[in-house]
Structures are given as C-alpha cells and as structure tokens.
C-alpha cells in the first residue's frame, strides 16, 4: 500500500514538468522520467523487502526468547524439585505433576504428566487428565483437591495400578486443609474397611505441581462400580434391576449446570416423613451416580425410582415394622446399621444428608448404604449445628438445624423408632466396642497415623507451605497453635464421644 502511495505522489509531482518540455525533446525526457520512476519504484520495493525481512527476524527472535523463557522455567522447576527433595527426609512417595504451564480448572480436565518418586527414584510415570474437585473446598480452601484420570497417549482412559492400588482409571488427590491433623478422612475409611465395609483405599503422599510444593495429600479411589470398589453388576437392557449407585448430595462440578430432573429426582416425602405438597419448602434429592445422569436410560430411571419409592412407602406405612410388609423387604439392614455407627462415632455433621452414597445390585439385591465419603469436618471439626460437641446424635440434625438448606431424610428417625433396628444397633455396637471400635484400638490408629506423618516430616513441610496452625479455617471449632494441640483435641474428643455413645446406645 505504501509503495503505491509513493508512486502516485511522484507521478503527480512530475506531470507538470512533462507539460513544459518542448516537443523536440519530449520523447527523450519522457524516457528519462520513466527510468527515474522505475529506479524509485525499485528502491521502494527494496525498502519494503527489507522491512519484511526485518519483521521476520523480529519474529524469529521473539520465538527464540519464548523458547528460552520456557527453558528457564523448566530449569527453575527442576531446581525447585531439587530443593524440595533435598529438604525431604521421607520414606513416603512424592507425586510430581507437570501441566506444561496450563492452569488446572474445574471441568474440563487438562492433560498433564504424573511421576511418583520414592527415595528420589521414579517408580511410576503416567499421562493423566486433572481437574479441581469438591464444592465447598474449591470456594473456601486455598489448598485444593484434585480429580485425576489416567490416560493413554491419545487421551483415552487407561486402567493402571496407581500407587499399587487395584487397577482403575479414576482417582482423587485429597488435600486436607481445615482438618489440621490431616487424618480424619483416612481414620474413618480405615475403620470402615476394618469392620468389613468397603471404603476408599488411602495413602499419604507429598505433592508438587509445576515445581510448586503443595504439601501433604491423600491418594484415594473414586467411588465407582468396580470389582475392587463397589462390587455390583453392570446394568444393561437385559437386566435393569441393577446395579445402581445413588447419592444424596448437593450439585458440584459439571452437575451445577443441570436441573434435578436431569441429575436425579426428588423424594415424595419431606425430611420429616410427610408427603410433600406444593407448599413444602424442604425436599430430599436423589442423584444418579452409576449409571450417571448422561448415560442412564429412561427404563433404568423408572426402575430405580420406583424401587426407592416402594422402600420409602413401606418405611412410612403403619406396617413398617413388619418383616415382610415393611422396610426390611427392601434394604440390607446390617449395612444400614454399620453406616449409622460410622457416622455417629465420628459425629459427621454432613451425615445422612450430604456425600451420602447407597447402592443396589441386580436381581433380588437389596439397598445397601455406603461407601462412606467425606469426613473432613467430622470428629469435632465443625462449629455449627452442634458438630463440635461430643454428645448428641447426628441423625437428629433436623431438630437442631431445621432451617438448613439440606436436611436428613426421614429414614433414620423412622428406623430408630423400630425396636428391631435399635436392637441390631445395640448388638453391633457391643460387638465392635470389644474390637475395632474399642477406645484403645481407635486411639492406636490415631497415633500410628500421626507417627507416619511426623517421622517423615510431612507436618513440618505441609504447615510451612500452608501456615495455618493457630488460624481459624472454616468450620474449625478448635484452633490449636501446634500439631500437638490438634491431636490432643482429637484424642480427647474421641474418648468423650465413645463414652457418650456407650450410654446413649444402651438407652435406645
């Protein structure tokens, strides 16, 4: 564009001169002018070419600078990793995740690489997809938790034995934050497995992402239908009786974009056991977990909704205590008893109303409660709705916090009004108190977990990264100034809770 502009200016300037020459010399002078114009045009073209060449050189230099910056970043990350490793005196493994500079978000997962090192040796390497997870924790906690999928090089799901766990593709890195003992989830999952109820396997790791040390994490299995997790049949069109995994919860992650009609359905009963009316302000929502909301077929929805409806109708009926006509026809009572005791021993403030899973196998499979999930604000680590007190029943949440947005289903108060169910609780409590639920056994677990973290320096490095000892983090009831303080509070709370339950269970 500039070349044409210059050419026109020159022509306009020279045309008057052409009109002044004599006819005799006209041809010679016109030829001379043409040569001058050609020379000027050549110069202008050369200038433009020079500019293009210069711009190309600038682009090349910019790319070189970008490459050098990436190399510098990689070296800095390596130095950080080296510094972190030199500060470690740990027999526990360390996970290193590299996203190539991409930011980890909540949906969709981004591609990354994962290495597990132990004693500075790489023992595993995987391609992964990674995203943020959790609802409340994402909003309130600086230390994030992550959902992982192990992938092949094309980005497709790949089952692997991550960390020595049974082969699967879906994993979670839980970052304890408000729980400053770092063990509440691990403790209750261990107790569940110890009494024969599957809960996610757990292992402590340290985590570094893109060269930044993130502290102590727990590698966990995501709740899924799998022979090594929730061992139920895959539902199909030939047999729609199971298996199913359902949950009672609020929406999180991608589920926030869906209505309850897409994700699940609402109970016909309110939390107090009355049939809902248009004026009912409180409701219980059942969400599809397996098959999930995107995959479940209409006939499968109809089947499992009707099964839950029949169970609730039987439980709400006058014949609910009858072995044949009542609720026992639909549920595995022993699993309900164990689920109840695990939630009560920890006084989980979310018990029965959030992160509450239950499942049904095919054919004549009944409804089973579990696996348990998300206990980081249990064992006295909640300052609302009496979650901090070691006395009181968790299942009576509705009487304490009736205005809360998510209440406990009527199931539990109704079950606890049946002498048969109460008898099963007393029997199981008495059995477990001599074994896995004995005060000595539970406190030994607490001490073993603490020693594991302490001897490997994980408290020191975690709280150097997250300097929150002595600081209130929602929803702390107790704020200890040290790890010793936090564990003293936990041990005292557990002993008080067990003593209260001994008396309370006997009086059911």
Task: Map each language-model feature to its residues.
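Extended alpha-helical stalk/coiled-coil segments
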Residues: 24-84
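Middle-to-C-terminal accessory/interaction subdomains
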Residues: 92-93, 103, 126-127, 135-137, ...
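Internal "kinase-insert"/substrate-recognition segments embedded within catalytic cores
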Residues: 154-155, 166-168, 175, 195-198, ...
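C-terminal motif of bacterial Sec signal peptides marking the signal peptidase cleavage site
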Residues: 19-22
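Conserved NTP-binding catalytic cores of kinases and kinase-like/nucleotidyltransferase enzymes
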Residues: 83-182, 187
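Short, well-structured beta-strand/strand-turn elements
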Residues: 195-206, 348
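Short, solvent-exposed loop/turn and secondary-structure capping segments
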Residues: 107-108, 159-162, 184-185, 217-219, ...
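Bacterial N-terminal signal peptides that target proteins for export
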Residues: 1-10
């Amino acid at each position: 564009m500039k070349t044409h502009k210059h050419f026109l200016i020159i022509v306009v300037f020279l045309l008057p001169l052409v009109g002044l020459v004599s006819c005799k010399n006209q041809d010679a002078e016109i030829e001379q002018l043409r040569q001058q114009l050609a020379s000027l045009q050549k110069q202008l073209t050369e200038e433009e070419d020079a500019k293009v060449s210069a711009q190309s050189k600038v682009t090349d230099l910019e790319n070189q600078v970008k490459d050098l910056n990436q190399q510098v970043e990689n070296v800095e990350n390596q130095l950080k990793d080296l510094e972190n490793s030199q500060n470690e005196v740990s027999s526990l493994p360390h996970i290193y995740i590299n996203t190539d500079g991409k930011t980890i978000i909540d949906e969709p997962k981004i591609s990354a690489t994962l290495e597990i090192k132990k004693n500075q040796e790489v023992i595993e390497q995987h391609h992964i997809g990674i995203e943020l997870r959790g609802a409340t924790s994402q909003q309130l906690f600086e230390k994030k938790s992550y959902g992982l999928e192990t992938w092949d090089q094309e980005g497709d799901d790949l089952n692997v034995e991550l960390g020595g766990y049974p082969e699967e593709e879906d994993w979670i890195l839980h970052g304890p934050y408000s729980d400053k003992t770092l063990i509440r989830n691990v403790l209750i999952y261990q107790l569940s497995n110890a009494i024969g109820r599957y809960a996610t396997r757990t292992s402590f790791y340290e985590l570094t992402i893109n060269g930044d040390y993130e502290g102590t994490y727990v590698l966990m299995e995501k709740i899924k239908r799998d022979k090594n997790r929730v061992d139920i049949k895959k539902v199909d069109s030939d047999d729609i009786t199971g298996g199913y995994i359902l949950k009672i919860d609020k929406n999180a992650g991608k589920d926030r974009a869906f209505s309850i009609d897409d994700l699940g359905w609402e109970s016909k009963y309110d939390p107090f056991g009355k049939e809902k009316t248009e004026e009912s302000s409180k409701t219980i929502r059942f969400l599809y977990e397996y098959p999930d909301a995107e995959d479940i077929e209409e006939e499968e929805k109809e089947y499992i909704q009707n099964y839950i409806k029949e169970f609730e109708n039987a439980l709400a009926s006058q014949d609910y205590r009858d072995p044949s006509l009542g609720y026992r026809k639909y549920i595995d009572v022993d699993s309900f008893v164990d689920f109840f005791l695990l939630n009560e021993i920890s006084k989980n403030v979310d018990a029965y109303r959030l992160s509450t899973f239950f499942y049904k196998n095919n054919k004549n499979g009944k409804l089973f409660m579990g696996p348990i999930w998300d206990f980081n604000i249990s064992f006295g680590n909640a300052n609302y709705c009496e979650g901090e007190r070691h006395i009181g029943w968790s299942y009576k949440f509705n009487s304490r916090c009736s205005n809360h947005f998510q209440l406990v289903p009527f199931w539990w108060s109704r079950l606890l009004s049946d002498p048969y169910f109460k008898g099963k609780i007393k029997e199981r409590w008495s059995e477990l108190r001599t074994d896995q639920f004995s005060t000595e056994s539970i406190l030994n677990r607490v001490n073993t977990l603490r020693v594991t973290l302490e001897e490997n320096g994980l408290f020191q490095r975690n709280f150097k990264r997250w300097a929150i000892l002595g600081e209130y983090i929602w929803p702390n009831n107790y704020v200890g100034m040290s790890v010793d303080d936090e564990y003293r509070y936990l041990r005292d709370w557990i002993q008080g809770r067990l003593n209260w339950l001994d008396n309370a269970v006997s009086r059911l």
